Regions:
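Glycine/proline-enriched, intrinsically flexible loops and inter-domain linkers
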Residues: 1-423
């Protein structure tokens, strides 16, 4: 409202010429949107950031540690906290509160045909299946990056980043024709708890009588489950590249489910994790992030997301642009980088240097605590070149005027065959 805008605009204008430290958080207009677990997480050391009004746990302070940011262009005061969270996800099990996800229900007798027209992937799947897809514009650019879960013959749940919810709702509503379809923002009705890591199945079996085996609950499916003394819908997907489930829980049962997971988690080393860890894990796995690595100006094929595009399914927005790009060839590729020196950091917008020449910028960066160095993604021009041509070059990333040698890969450096998510 106007009171929110008055506070926030006064701060943003004042920051225009200030030092834009990495991870700098706004101080005004805070606490407007909170998860049902906000006070639970606060009591356990959460240090919050804000996106789209949502208070989200960015990292968790240790007992006796100050619960605030100390900004720097080098390693900030939460670096070791993130490392512990990151390695817990890679080697044990972590719990993320992702209630800030945007959740959109699309239903009606024309819901399937509507989504087939807007989404690049195949939407005609069995109820219970989860589809990773993009919504494209006429140029093949990415308007939205989302998962779609088919709940029934006529109902679908779209899960989008919290920061893009209003944009995605507008795009959907803009493209409704003379169709019987209802589009509803259902975000306030459910919280999302993400149980992620190789010990995720062990934890889930302690709190639920349901079967979480690969046979009963394979990757890319959603199941209704009992958990503690409550109910949830468990989606077997991941944004960190590990075995895990996103638990969609009615907001009135969220605290109970959290407490059940926390109590059972003591036996398996459960660790609460924040958004900074989510980000570092997803960049290790080379998962794209909308607004950084993929935007409406980035072609879906050049972003390396062709596996989620099905031109043979029939017409959809952007199909002609996809076919044209496929026939013409890619003019650039999204590449993953890891610095050879473990000390420097990558944040965003650092120059990519190929064979001594600046050719692009880093779209997103963080520290790969498992890979052992700073990691990032960025586009590299590759007109008429093969994958081998691109990877045969020498790459450096320019950081504060110094060029640091970097390893480059077109596949995820962490678990390139995606075996861990299907453990």
């Amino acid at each position: 409202n106007r009171a929110y805008l008055k506070d926030r605009v006064s701060e943003t204008l004042g920051l225009l010429y200030a030092d834009h430290f990495p991870y700098r958080q706004m101080a005004t207009a805070r606490g407007v949107r909170r998860s049902p677990l906000h006070e639970h997480l606060k009591a356990r050391g959460a240090v919050f950031g804000e996106v789209a009004g949502w208070e989200r746990a960015n990292w968790f302070a240790n007992d006796g540690q100050e619960r605030e940011y100390r900004y720097s262009w080098k390693r900030q005061n939460w670096f070791e906290n993130q490392k512990a969270e990151h390695l817990a996800v890679r080697n044990g099990v972590g719990l993320f509160d992702m209630t800030s996800f945007g959740k959109i229900r699309v239903e009606g007798r024309d819901a399937l045909s509507f989504l087939q027209r807007l989404c690049a992937n195949e939407m005609n799947v069995e109820p219970g299946r989860i589809v990773y897809t993009q919504m494209l514009n006429g140029r093949g650019g990415i308007e939205s990056d989302l998962t779609v879960t088919r709940l029934s013959e006529t109902a679908f749940l779209l899960v989008v980043p919290g920061a893009t919810l209003q944009r995605d709702l507008a795009w959907l509503r803009k493209h409704v024709r003379d169709e019987f379809v209802v589009i509803t923002d259902v975000g306030a009705g459910e919280s999302v708890l993400c149980v992620m890591g190789p010990k995720a199945r062990d934890l889930m079996q302690k709190v639920s009588p349901n079967d979480f085996s690969n046979a009963a609950h394979p990757f890319g499916t959603a199941r209704e489950i009992e958990i503690g003394m409550g109910l949830a819908r468990a989606h077997r997907v991941t944004y960190v590249g590990e075995l895990g489930w996103e638990l969609y829980v009615s907001t009135d049962q969220t605290a109970h489910v959290f407490e059940a997971l926390e109590e059972a988690g003591q036996d398996v080393g459960l660790k609460l994790c924040g958004i900074h860890t989510l980000d570092s894990c997803r960049i290790e796995k080379a998962f794209r992030h909308f607004g950084h690595d993929i935007t409406d100006e980035d072609h879906v094929l050049e972003a390396g997301l062709g596996f989620a595009v099905k031109p043979d399914k029939g017409d959809f927005i952007g199909r002609e642009a996809v076919l044209a790009k496929h026939n013409r060839g890619l003019s650039r590729r999204l590449v993953q980088f890891r610095l050879a020196d473990p000390e420097p950091l990558i944040f965003h917008n650092e120059a990519i240097v190929r064979d001594g020449k600046i050719v692009g910028t880093i779209t997103s960066g963080n520290y790969g605590h498992h890979l052992g160095g700073a990691i990032g993604l960025g586009y590299v021009p590759s007109e008429g070149e093969s994958d081998a041509d691109v990877l045969g070059s020498s790459f450096e990333i320019e950081i504060a005027g110094t060029r640091v040698k970097a390893e480059a890969s077109l596949k995820a450096m962490y678990d390139p065959r995606a075996e861990r998510v299907r453990m």
